[in-house]
Curated annotation (Swiss-Prot):
Gene transcribed to yield this protein: dhcr7
Binding site for NADP(+): K356, R360, M393, W398, N405, Y406, D445, C449, S450, S451, K452, Y453, Y460
Segments crossing the lipid bilayer: 36-56, 97-117, 175-195, 264-284, 304-324, 329-349, 419-439
Protein name: 7-dehydrocholesterol reductase
Region Disordered, annotated ranges: 1-20
Chain's role: Catalyzes the last step of the cholesterol synthesis pathway, which transforms cholesta-5,7-dien-3beta-ol (7-dehydrocholesterol,7-DHC) into cholesterol by reducing the C7-C8 double bond of its sterol core. Can also metabolize cholesta-5,7,24-trien-3beta-ol (7-dehydrodemosterol, 7-DHD) to desmosterol, which is then metabolized by the Delta(24)-sterol reductase (DHCR24) to cholesterol.
Keywords: Cholesterol biosynthesis, Cholesterol metabolism, Endoplasmic reticulum, Lipid biosynthesis, Lipid metabolism, Membrane, NADP, Oxidoreductase, Steroid biosynthesis, Steroid metabolism, Sterol biosynthesis, Sterol metabolism, Transmembrane, Transmembrane helix
Length: 473
């Protein structure tokens, strides 16, 4: 194991003919850890689970008033033990529900190869290739997320309106006990990934060791950990069980609103519709997702494993949870405005990504906004010493800003929050978090590209100077 670490650590740089130092295989997470990164990692490991618990507890015990628990503790009206005593414990019912859920998603992922791509025009499913890894490999993936999502939701509606095997409110009725189950899976997966990377990695050349336990545990060591040929940890845990569950969780919230108040408010419908568009878009473009930063940059550790099991399903669905406890009926004008903001944001997000995908598929032999797109050609060297070429487009939305897809994503995120009105801060956490996440991702992605492409990246940033907001940032 020590020899593998030394071998990996020596792969950083290589001399080329002109004597300059050329970065080799330098994308992916860091080889070394600075103090700020280490402090951030330790902070997240210590407090991220508490943040999730605090948000969910605030709704369960304080009607989603974020400051109320702190004020009660400060004033002496409540003690930590009082809050904890009111928190639902882990139950066997929740364990059985969660085990059934995860097992069902594993079954759909592993044992039902995609057939939708055979008769749904425009959909790219089945066996697809990912991007080249730092070690120079191109992995193949079984893309069947849209099929899994469709089957899951057809069964959910069949149960809700015909079979009645379980209540449509089953998720929210067991929401906090399910939180403990999700944490158990998240930590188990992250720990297994750490052990696997050290003792039986899928590809040792795509492992990165820093020598710091906390950083390696959180950010991951293996680039693409797998069990067997097809069970890819990244693809499974990012899409299933988290994102497939996203829309089911929202449907459970809507069912609870109907049960409690006798109606589903237009704000709940808006949240369900706008977030469902995002989820379906994700699975429709799952093969495109194989070329994004999560697959092409991140190693698999606690950040992805626990985050996909806990952070995503619990904090990305806060708007629906808030509306269960605080139903909001928007005016027609406000509802239309929120809908338009969400749809325009989605259009920018989707068309920006579509332009990039079209440009890649055709190697630039296409038209963007009626013209042949302009680009800057770059080269990089993978860890196996091979030289590869890429083109960075500077036309269409990609000529307006380097990450305008993130701008559209943020517009959609804001729409989800605005549907909840302005009485509480809690539903706006998602927009605040996504802003921080995507700005950080901009910087992280550009650091990766700068390491990967060198001086060619500087030419690109000169041609497209803004990241998210033209004229501002």
């Amino acid at each position: 194991m020590g020899e593998r670490r030394r071998a990996n650590a020596s792969r950083g740089d290589k001399k080329v003919a002109n004597g300059e130092k050329q970065h080799v295989g330098q994308w992916g997470r860091a080889w070394e850890v600075d103090y700020f990164s280490l402090a951030s990692v330790i902070f997240l490991l210590a407090f991220a689970p508490l943040i999730v618990y605090y948000f969910v507890m605030s709704c369960d015990q304080y009607q989603c008033a974020l400051t109320a628990p702190v004020l009660d503790l400060y004033s002496g009206k409540a003690r930590l033990s009082d809050i904890w005593d009111k928190t639902p414990a882990l139950t066997w019912t929740a364990v059985k529900i969660y085990l059934a859920w995860v097992s069902f998603q594993v079954f759909l992922y592993m044992f039902l190869p995609d057939i939708l791509h055979k008769f749904v025009p425009g959909y790219e499913g089945g066996v697809q290739e990912g991007a080249r890894t730092p070690a120079g490999l191109i992995n193949k993936y079984q893309v069947n997320g849209l099929q899994a999502w469709t089957i899951t939701h057809l069964l959910w509606f069949a149960n809700a309106y015909h079979f009645h095997w379980f209540s449509p409110t089953i998720v929210i009725d067991n929401w906090i006990p399910l939180l403990w189950c999700a944490n158990l899976l998240g930590y188990s997966v992250a720990t297994f990934a750490l052990v696997k990377a050290n003792f039986f990695p899928t590809n040792a050349n795509d492992c990165k060791f820093t020598g710091n336990f906390f950083y390696d545990y959180m950010m991951g060591i293996e680039f693409n950990p797998r069990i067997g040929k097809w069970f890819d940890f990244k693809l499974f845990f990012n899409g299933r069980p988290g994102i497939v569950a996203w829309t089911l969780i929202n449907l459970s919230y809507a069912a609870k609103q109907q049960e409690l108040y006798g109606q589903v408010t237009n704000s709940m419908i808006l949240v369900n519709v706008l977030q469902a568009i995002y989820v379906v878009d994700f699975f429709w473009n799952e093969s495109w997702y194989l070329k994004t930063i999560d697959i092409c940059h991140d190693h698999f550790g606690w950040y992805l494993g626990w985050g996909d099991c806990v952070w995503l399903p619990y904090l990305y669905t806060l708007q629906g949870l808030y509306l269960v406890y605080n139903p909001v009926e928007l005016s027609t004008t406000a509802a239309v405005a929120v809908l338009l903001l969400g749809l325009i944001g989605y259009y920018i997000f989707r068309m920006t990504n579509h332009q990039k995908d079209l440009f890649r598929r055709t190697n630039g032999n296409c038209k963007i906004w009626g013209k042949k797109p302009k680009s800057i050609e770059c080269f990089y060297v993978s860890a196996d010493g091979k030289r590869h070429y890429s083109k960075l487009m500077i036309s269409g939305f990609w000529g307006v800003a380097r990450h305008l897809n993130y701008t559209g994503d943020l517009m959609g995120s804001l729409a989800y929050c605005l549907a909840c009105g302005f009485d509480h801060l809690l539903p706006y956490f998602y927009f605040i978090y996504m802003t921080i996440l995507l700005v950080h991702r901009c910087i992280r992605d550009e650091h990766r590209c700068s390491s990967k492409y060198g001086k060619d990246w500087k030419l690109y940033t000169s041609a497209v100077p803004y990241r998210l907001l033209p004229g501002l940032f």
